[in-house]
């Protein structure tokens, strides 16, 4: 069903949600399934948590998932969303609130009518800067680490900066990119955890991967995503030294940049810029239509020409 659902992202895939449930889930969880004439056309997992004196239903995956939604078959989105909201709100004795986070503007769950007797609040939640990648980006130029430069439509200053960074790296050694496989997955994740931590330690902060349960989750999720062909994990090396790692996903003509880490001792090489340039090149070469930087308004995202795309929060409560 996930593969047939046009709007479902990697954050709705079983490879992401099953590890999330195992590492962070509540004992009280359930999955709603929608069927038409016996055929499965919709699925969405939830859990229940008490907050502000109310038992509240949340989608599985909150906190570390940048987009939340159901997996709905094409043409069934509106019907599935309406049926699921009606089912969730049919018995206020079980729970008194439903909170749907990180919904994209075109989500059927954002548009579905609120059941009678439930208040309905909708508000902008996050911004996900995104670069559009036209389908004809692939080219025959030769500036990139990958051997082509499909980024010729990026701002001129970005392309110039990439060339300068590559030239500086080449004066120090041989820069090359290692792509994930089953054989090197653990080594690349080790590099990601180490470089991400080193980068944040320069700011006196632990970084989001300091927690052991998060690292364990990402190891399990990455293995499942790799098996499904959704994982995009790149390591930039200078000779044999790993100097940057980028962790992302690709599905349904969209690249999702989830997390990265780079060596803070090589500012003259700008390893973060180099690995991002490679990821954009790889996304364009695969025919992706968008490069999504996901949540957060860090200035570097806009240097690549990213434009904000919002997500929405919808809160349903029984009574006024």
Where does each model-flagged region fall?
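A conserved beta-strand-loop-helix scaffold within acyl/acetyltransferase catalytic domains
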Residues: 1-61, 93, 102-128, 132, ...
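Short, solvent-exposed loop/turn segments at the edges of secondary structure
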Residues: 62-67, 124-126, 296, 309
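Conserved acetyl-CoA-binding loop-helix of GNAT-fold acetyltransferases
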Residues: 76-88, 268-280
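Hydrophobic pocket-lining residues that define ligand/cofactor binding sites across diverse proteins
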Residues: 88, 92, 225, 283
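Conserved GNAT acetyl-CoA-binding A-motif
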Residues: 93-103, 283-294
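Conserved catalytic-core motifs of GNAT/GCN5-like acyltransferases
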Residues: 121-131, 308-319
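Hydrophobic, well-ordered secondary-structure elements that form the walls
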Residues: 240, 272, 276-279, 283, ...
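Substrate-binding beta-hairpin/strand module that engages nucleic acids
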Residues: 284-318
């Amino acid at each position: 069903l996930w593969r047939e659902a046009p709007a479902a992202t990697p954050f709705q895939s079983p490879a992401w949600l099953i590890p999330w449930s195992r590492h962070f889930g509540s004992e009280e969880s359930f999955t709603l399934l929608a069927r038409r004439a016996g055929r499965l056309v919709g699925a969405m997992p939830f859990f229940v948590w008490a907050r502000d004196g109310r038992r509240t239903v949340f989608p599985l995956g909150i906190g570390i998932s940048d987009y939340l939604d159901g997996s709905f078959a094409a043409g069934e989105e509106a019907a599935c969303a309406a049926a699921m909201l009606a089912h969730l709100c049919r018995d206020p004795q079980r729970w008194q609130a439903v909170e749907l986070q990180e919904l994209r503007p075109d989500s059927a769950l954002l548009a579905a009518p609120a059941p009678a007797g439930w208040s309905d609040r909708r508000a902008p939640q996050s911004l996900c800067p995104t670069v559009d990648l036209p389908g004809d980006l692939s080219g025959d130029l030769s500036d990139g680490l990958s051997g082509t430069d499909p980024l010729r439509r990026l701002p001129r200053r970005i392309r110039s900066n990439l060339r300068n960074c590559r030239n500086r790296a080449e004066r120090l050694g041989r820069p090359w990119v290692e792509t994930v496989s089953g054989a090197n997955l653990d080594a690349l994740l080790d590099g990601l955890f180490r470089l991400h931590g080193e980068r944040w330690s320069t700011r006196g902060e632990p970084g989001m991967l300091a927690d052991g349960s998060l690292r364990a989750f990402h190891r399990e999720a990455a293995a499942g995503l790799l098996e499904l062909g959704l994982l995009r994990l790149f390591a930039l090396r200078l000779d044999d030294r790993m100097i940057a790692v980028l962790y992302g996903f690709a599905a349904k003509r969209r690249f999702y940049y989830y997390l990265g880490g780079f060596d803070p001792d090589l500012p003259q090489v700008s390893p973060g810029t180099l690995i991002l340039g490679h990821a954009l090149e790889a996304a364009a070469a695969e025919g992706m239509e968008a490069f999504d930087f996901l949540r957060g308004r860090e200035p570097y995202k806009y240097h690549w020409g990213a434009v904000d795309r919002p997500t929405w929060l919808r809160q349903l409560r029984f009574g006024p």
